[in-house]
């Protein structure tokens, strides 16, 4: 009874906090009134000045990678984002000190002792910063709303977070700080937080949705639309960012920072595809989806099996300078080309004398195969680098030359 009275007292105290007090504590005009969830998402993005990251038929995301002097709760955030469904905000995520953004020198960039020493210092500093941000944020939120309650988010051991939770007018403020990983403050509806952030899209609905996303263009392109974009930013998070895209596309809630923890990403980036798959498995299967790993040649005649079902393919490859030059140039050249026969001849002429692409093991990368064109032997790829990289085209034979041989599909 005493415990219930304590929770009730905390709840009443938090309810008395005004919108103005909350916005002042955050340092941002987040709330126009006491209910964020009925606001127009574009209006929210406008007053926050956060750019749109992605928009699909059903949802949208907005993300800002702030400058160094940007502050929220008087702490430095490295990534600020929110998701919206049917143009209404559904969740907000603030990522403070973390091992991905706080370490700018990746392991593969260490060429000499000076770089090695600088990287070691960054690793020491980010671990201290995580502890400091976690302490400061908890103190500020407690001062604002009262003492937190303890809970957890996520339905899988590898992606589960212990959180400190404060409720305010239908909003749950959740602070997570896994040791040496990151400090995240998320704002969800109380209902969503009570459900652990989980959601469920029925198989029938998802199957119909996936089939409707297969676009067959008059020029012969077959392309998947409505794949969420997640911009990994400057860190080496291509694997967790791509997995977040695929999981959200298949109706499974995901966050690249949590997936990076599950995949045991190194400081500054660098993640094992196998470790990510193992870490995400429980979340994917818990949503009644399945993970399939295949080793196939990158070719329209092999990827069509999945694309025609509305399923994107996560592809492990080597993203070399030469590969990207070809993909960028080819994509630009093919714009406006409506005749597959003429385009096939143009590509063949351009490739005369072209040397085979050479894989570089220092340029490991994971992206998506999202389309194909059988008349020309092309495949479409999508990278987690923002809208400019949502759809690029490359010959299947060229893609095979830089392929690591592993592809992963989240299916029904």
Residue ranges, per PLM feature:
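Predominantly the structural core of cysteine protease catalytic domains
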Residues: 270-374
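Sec-dependent signal peptide recognition
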Residues: 1-7
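Short, surface-exposed coil-to-beta transition loops
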Residues: 75-78, 159-161, 168-172, 361-367
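Surface-exposed patches in mature extracellular/periplasmic domains of secreted proteins
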Residues: 150-154, 253-260, 288-298
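Long, charged/polar, surface-exposed segments that mediate recognition or autoinhibition
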Residues: 16, 35, 39-41, 46-158
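Solvent-exposed loop/turn segments at secondary-structure junctions
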Residues: 233-237, 244-245, 264-270, 298-300, ...
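Active-site-adjacent structural segments surrounding the nucleophilic cysteine of cysteine proteases
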Residues: 16-41, 49, 53-54, 160-286
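Noncatalytic regulatory segments and standalone regulatory/sensor domains
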Residues: 167, 184-219, 341-412
């Amino acid at each position: 009874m005493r415990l219930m009275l304590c929770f009730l007292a905390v709840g009443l105290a938090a309810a008395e906090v005004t919108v103005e007090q909350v916005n002042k504590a955050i340092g941002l005009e987040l709330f126009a009134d006491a209910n964020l969830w009925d606001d127009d998402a574009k209006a929210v993005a406008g007053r926050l000045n956060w750019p749109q990251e992605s928009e699909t038929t059903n949802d949208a995301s907005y993300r800002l990678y702030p400058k160094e002097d940007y502050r929220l709760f008087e702490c430095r955030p490295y990534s600020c984002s929110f998701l919206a469904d049917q143009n209404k905000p559904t969740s907000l995520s603030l990522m403070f000190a973390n091992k991905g953004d706080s370490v700018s020198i990746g392991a593969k960039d260490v060429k000499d002792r000076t770089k090695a020493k600088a990287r070691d210092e960054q690793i020491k500093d980010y671990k201290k910063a995580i502890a400091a941000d976690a302490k400061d944020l908890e103190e500020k939120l407690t001062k604002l709303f009262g003492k937190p309650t303890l809970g957890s988010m996520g339905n899988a051991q590898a992606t589960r977070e212990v959180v400190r939770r404060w409720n305010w007018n239908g909003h749950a403020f959740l602070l997570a700080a896994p040791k040496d990983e990151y400090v995240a403050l998320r704002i969800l509806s109380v209902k969503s937080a009570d459900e652990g952030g989980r959601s469920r899209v029925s198989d029938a609905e998802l199957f119909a949705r996936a089939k409707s996303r297969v676009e067959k263009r008059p020029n012969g392109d077959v392309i998947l639309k409505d794949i969420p974009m997640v911009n990994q930013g400057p860190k080496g998070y291509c694997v967790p960012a791509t997995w977040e895209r695929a999981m959200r596309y298949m109706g499974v809630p995901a966050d690249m920072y949590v997936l990076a923890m599950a995949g045991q990403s190194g400081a500054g980036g660098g993640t094992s595809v196998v470790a990510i798959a193992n870490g995400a498995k429980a979340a994917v299967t818990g949503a009644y989806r399945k993970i399939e790993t295949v080793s196939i040649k990158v070719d329209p005649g092999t990827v069509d099996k999945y694309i025609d079902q509305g399923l994107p393919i996560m592809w492990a490859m080597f993203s070399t300078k030469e590969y990207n030059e070809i993909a960028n140039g080819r994509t630009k050249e093919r714009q406006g080309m409506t005749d597959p026969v003429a385009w096939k001849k143009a590509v063949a002429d351009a490739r005369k004398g072209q040397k085979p692409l050479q894989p570089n093991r220092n340029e490991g990368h994971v992206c998506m195969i999202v389309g194909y064109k059988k008349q020309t032997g092309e495949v479409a790829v999508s990278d987690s680098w923002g809208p400019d990289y949502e759809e690029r085209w490359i010959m299947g034979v060229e893609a095979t030359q830089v392929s690591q041989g592993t592809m992963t599909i989240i299916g029904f």
